[in-house]
From Swiss-Prot:
Organism from which the protein derives: Geobacillus kaustophilus (strain HTA426)
GO CC aspect terms: plasma membrane; proton-transporting ATP synthase complex
Name this protein carries in UniProt: ATP synthase subunit b
GO molecular function: proton-transporting ATP synthase activity, rotational mechanism; proton-transporting ATPase activity, rotational mechanism
Species classification: Bacteria, Bacillati, Bacillota, Bacilli, Bacillales
Keywords: ATP synthesis, Cell membrane, CF(0), Hydrogen ion transport, Ion transport, Membrane, Transmembrane, Transmembrane helix, Transport
Main location class: membrane
TM helices/strands, residue ranges: 15-35
Function of the protein: F(1)F(0) ATP synthase produces ATP from ADP in the presence of a proton or sodium gradient. F-type ATPases consist of two structural domains, F(1) containing the extramembraneous catalytic core and F(0) containing the membrane proton channel, linked together by a central stalk and a peripheral stalk. During catalysis, ATP synthesis in the catalytic domain of F(1) is coupled via a rotary mechanism of the central stalk subunits to proton translocation.
Lipid bilayer topology: Single-pass membrane protein
Length: 177
């Protein structure tokens, strides 16, 4: 049957002999074997290396993307914490300022009250001194009048003159201060 096929092929090929076909077929098989041994395997190795390289690049890109997302999330969390800390600092500063304001106002009120009390005491002391001085003057004038009355007996009109003179002396003494 092989010969018949070769003969038919030979006839169909218009002058190509069966030996040539077998020779070409044998050469083609040898070429395939050589290509498989020397070219196919290195070509497949290169394709496999390229495939591995691309897969590695994809894996690395995915890892970098995940790391970038992780870093982005960390940065967002840090920003959130920073904002919260800043808000807390502002709130603490506001509270501290309010407390200091209240302390300053309370201190100023206490100082004003102290100054007021000191002024009241000073006024009271000066009033007491003025009253004591006035009592001394009244006492000395009373003694003086009594001694003058005793020295001479005065008429009612003389007594009035004496009292008016005494009042005038007191007014002059009070006005001289």
């Amino acid at each position: 049957m092989w010969k018949a096929n070769v003969w038919v092929l030979g006839e169909a090929a218009h002058g190509i002999s069966g030996g040539t076909i077998i020779y070409q077929l044998l050469m083609f098989i040898i070429l395939l074997a050589l290509l498989r041994k020397f070219a196919w395997q290195p070509l497949m190795n290169i394709m496999k290396q390229r495939e591995e390289h691309i897969a590695n690049e994809i894996d690395q890109a995915e890892k970098r993307r995940q790391e970038a997302e992780k870093l982005l999330e960390e940065q967002r969390e840090l920003m959130k914490q920073s904002r919260q800390e800043a808000q807390a600092l502002i709130e603490n500063a506001r509270k501290l300022a309010e407390e200091q304001k209240e302390q300053i106002v309370a201190s100023a009120r206490a100082e004003a009250e102290r100054v007021k009390e000191v002024a009241k005491k000073e006024i009271e002391r000066e009033k007491e001194q003025a009253m004591a001085a006035l009592r001394e003057q009244v006492a000395s004038l009373s003694v003086l009048i009594a001694s003058k009355v005793i020295e001479k007996e005065l008429t009612e009109q003389d007594q009035r003159k004496l009292i008016e003179a005494y009042i005038k002396d007191v007014q002059e003494a009070g006005g001289a201060r």
